[in-house]
């Protein structure tokens, strides 16, 4: 089987505020923003270089409360550079956490959903 994750729903309270954060602060691409009906708005945002997107919106039918996602983990090339870029854009992010299995930067979106950004270790170094 060949499976690829396409979309992760991220529960938010204010769609416009969340969209601005993800696009302006984190550099996500705004792929789609459509008000389908009065009750339904679907916004798809994709991290640069990712084949998987997130969806935020209104009336999407999810049962998760805004801010309840405890960890969404993505891979980044350089934890130090990403941390510096985030802080330069005013994003509150924790400093680099060094672990044997990678280097991590943690942040929260305006609703409190937690993102962990992981720089993978250089396994070729032996």
Where would I find each of the regions flagged by the language model?
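N-terminal beta-strand motif that seeds the catalytic metal site of vicinal oxygen chelate
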Residues: 1-19, 69-72, 121-126
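Core segments of cupin and vicinal oxygen chelate
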Residues: 2-3, 10-52, 88
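Conserved short beta-strand elements that form part of the metal-binding/catalytic scaffold
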Residues: 29-67, 108, 114-121
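Conserved S-adenosyl-L-methionine
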Residues: 32-34, 94-97
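Short hydrophobic/aromatic beta-strand element in the GNAT-like acyltransferase core
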Residues: 42, 73, 93, 104-106, ...
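Mid-chain, well-packed structural core segment of small domains
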Residues: 71-83
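A beta-strand edge to alpha-helix "cap/lid" segment located at domain peripheries
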Residues: 76, 88, 119-123
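Short, small/polar residue-rich loop motifs at catalytic or cofactor-binding pockets
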Residues: 100-102
């Amino acid at each position: 089987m060949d499976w690829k994750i396409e979309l992760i729903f991220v529960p938010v309270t204010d769609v416009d505020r969340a969209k601005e954060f993800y696009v302006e602060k984190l550099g996500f691409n705004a792929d789609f923003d459509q008000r389908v009906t009065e009750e339904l708005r679907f916004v798809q945002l994709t991290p640069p270089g990712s084949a998987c997107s997130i969806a935020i919106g209104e009336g999407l039918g999810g049962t998760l409360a805004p801010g309840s996602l405890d960890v969404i983990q993505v891979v980044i090339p350089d934890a130090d550079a990403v941390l510096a870029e985030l802080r330069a854009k005013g994003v509150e992010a924790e400093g680099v956490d060094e672990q044997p299995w990678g280097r991590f930067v943690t942040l929260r979106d305006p609703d409190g959903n937690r993102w962990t950004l992981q720089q993978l270790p250089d396994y070729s170094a032996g």
